[in-house]
Structure formats: structure tokens, C-alpha cells
Amino acid sequence: MSAIVDITSREILDSRGNPTVEVEVELSSGARGRAAVPSGASTGAHEAVELRDGDKSRYGGKGVLKACSHVENDILEVLQGAESEDQIAIDNAMIDLDGTPNKSRLGANAILGVSLAVAKATAEELELPLYRYVGGAYAHLLPVPMMNIVNGGEHADNPIDIQEFMIQPVGAPTVADAIRMGSEIFARLKKGLSEAGYNTNVGDEGGFAPNLKSADEALGFIAKSVEAAGYKLGEDVTFALDCAATEFYADGRYNLKGEGKEFDASGMISYLEDLANRYPIVSIEDGLAEDDWEGWAELTTRLGKKLQLVGDDLFVTNPERLRRGIKAGTGNALLVKVNQIGTLTETLEAVETAHKAGYACVMSHRSGETEDSVIADLAVATNCGQIKTGSLSRSDRTAKYNQLIRIEQQLGSAARYAGRSILKNS
């Protein structure tokens, strides 16, 4: 085993041009690991805290020099000499050093950067791919991509209230074929939107962000694109939504301003149910607001047997909030975002907790991403079976798809694509 000898950090840019933290860890063996930390736009109120400088003269106050300083001073002082393979002890040492329930003193962006860089350095020393080091010998399941090809909500400057409209190539035989199918559908969608007179600018996650008026219109364009690409709806390709409902929830009401509609929780559930009855939607993320526990209970009762109901803002990859949801029978799937909780150890604990309770897991990017493809490895390491990493454009998104293709090739005959096994009624 090797000890940590040095930790360095720097301010780099994410995919939105905002600063974020990058960390490098060096071991006594000479092995090194580097990790860049993503950032979200529609963030849950219960997420671990991302430390920003607040200095308006730099990056409009979004600088992360304080977080970088914590890495190179406070955290290095505690971790220098620690054995890199003891990931749990390393992560717990940083949690204890921070001393807050939400990592607000050192910053989850500082802590996560170190946590992931340590894992990468150790994997390099052991001459193992990261997915194998973290997941062990049974890490061989390639996830179904949830490809966000139409962006709305906080991810785009258009009237669409729902944040993400995704396709899932469940009928593909391999992840490489799934990515190819997604690319072909994406190209058809661009052609269809352009011919209808809509712009084909892309949003934060690489999906198109046209000025469509409703979710129904967006789903209609996607359905036509799937068929134009030669695939069968519901058989080759299914749909998924991320409503990010907290963003349009206030005073007990869900206000879809773009569509001119307003609902209570029951009405919002009926709205989603109608869409799911008319399109091959198999998964809905954050269909209701993060603290509308009563509404979520009704949502799960009404739709949970036939649809995957994913908690993102609801659970924020936090094992404690997840356990509350499991106990209450709320939702049936966890969205996994490493920066919501802030360490690799806690992320793996959340996935294990979800799997033990029979909840599905979806590994996820953030809207502010980097070229770091770590979530592709973690999706395979944890046997999640599903991954959200944006559309088929922008290299910050395609970097993850390209890494999945590499992993599948490395695994050879041992590789398995999750495919239709992720469906509730498969």
C-alpha cells in the first residue's frame, strides 16, 4: 500500500464557464489521481454545500479559491501519510475535519475532489481500471443511457417547464449500439425541429432547447424522431422525464407557466399519468417537489407499480433522507450524484441502501460538468444499470459515453448491457 504524499488543487472551468475545483493526489509510489468536481443548476435544498468565494470581483463571486485552499492546507495536513486504499477512513477523516452536517466549512467541492482523486490514484497504483477497483470482480453491467435530447426548465432559455426529456435505447444489444441509436435519433430530431422552423440551439446538457409550448409537443417531436430513425417506440426506445418540480412549486401549487396550467399535487400526478398513458414513458424523476412528502406518497401509490419514480432533489444521494423515503414507501429509485453528498464512501453507501431496499439506481452527471468521466466508471462499479449523462453533443457529455464504450470493450465477453431489465414490467 502507498501513502498520500501530496495533494494539490486548482480552479478550472466547468461546461458553463464557471469555476470549479480540480484536485490531484500523489502517492508515495508515484501514482497520481486527478478529479474535477461538477456543479448543478437545479440544486436540492438538502444537498451538501458547494463552497464559493463570494468575491464579486472574480467570476461574479463564483470563484473556488477558498475550497482549493482548504484542499492544500486543512485537508492535506490531515491526510498526508494516510494509506490511500483505506477510502472509508480517508473520507471519514475529511467529514470529521469539516464538522458540519452539510460540509459547509470546507466545501463539498473540496472534499469530493480529494475523495475521487484518492480513489483514482489508488486504482492507478494497483494497475486497475477505476470501475474494477471500486466495484470488484462483479462490476460488468453496462448501464442504459437516459439521453436528455430536449432541455427545458433551468437547463434552457425556453418556455418548457419540464427540465429533461430523455430517450432510453433499451432494445440495444450493447452500450455501444445504444449510444449509436441515441445519436441517430438525435440527428433525426435536429432535422425535424429545423424543418418545423424551430431553432436547434442546445441547452446545458447538450439537448435541443426549442421554443416549444408544452411537454406534449416535445414528446411528439421525439416520438416522430425515434420512428424516423427506424426504431419502435416502447420496444427499442422508451422515454423518461425529469420534471425538477421543485423549481415550479410554491405554496402547495405546481405552476406550469409555459403551459398556463396550475395544479395541486393530485392534479400534477394526473397530468404526468396522462403523458405516461400516451407516450412510452417508463421513468419520471422529481415529479413532485423535494419536501412534498405527502404528494410523493400519493404519486408512489398511483404510479409506482408501473413507472420508475426517481428521487433526485427528494433524496439528494443522502443515505438518511433515502432511509426516510424507504420507510415511508416514497418513490422506488434513487438518482446518484456524487457531489450531492460529497464523498465516494457516502455515495456507495446510498447505492447499497437503495439496492437492499429494492430501489433502482441511476448514476447521474450535473448540468455543470467537466471532461472528467468518473461517473461512467462508477455506474459500472455499482451495477446501477442506468446512467444520466446528457445528450449526444458537447464533449463534457460525450466524454462519459466514450468511456462506457471503452469499458465495454475492456470487459469483452464479460460485459452485459442492462437493456430491458431496467423496466418495471420487464
UniProtKB/Swiss-Prot annotation:
Essential cofactor(s): Mg(2+)
Pathway(s) annotated for this protein in UniProt: Carbohydrate degradation; glycolysis; pyruvate from D-glyceraldehyde 3-phosphate: step 4/5
Keyword Secreted annotated: yes
InterPro entries documented for this protein: Enolase, Enolase-like_C_sf, Enolase-like_N, Enolase_C, Enolase_CS, Enolase_N
Protein's UniProt keywords contain Metal-binding: yes
Catalytic activity: (2R)-2-phosphoglycerate = phosphoenolpyruvate + H2O
GO biological process, one term: glycolytic process
PROSITE patterns to which the protein is assigned, alphabetical: ENOLASE
Matching Pfam families: Enolase_C (PF00113), Enolase_N (PF03952)
Principal subcellular localisation of the protein: cytoplasm
Assigned keywords, A-Z: Cytoplasm, Glycolysis, Lyase, Magnesium, Metal-binding, Secreted
Task of the protein: Catalyzes the reversible conversion of 2-phosphoglycerate (2-PG) into phosphoenolpyruvate (PEP). It is essential for the degradation of carbohydrates via glycolysis.
Family: Belongs to the enolase family.
Name under which the protein is recorded: Enolase
Species of the source: Gluconobacter oxydans (strain 621H)
Gene: eno
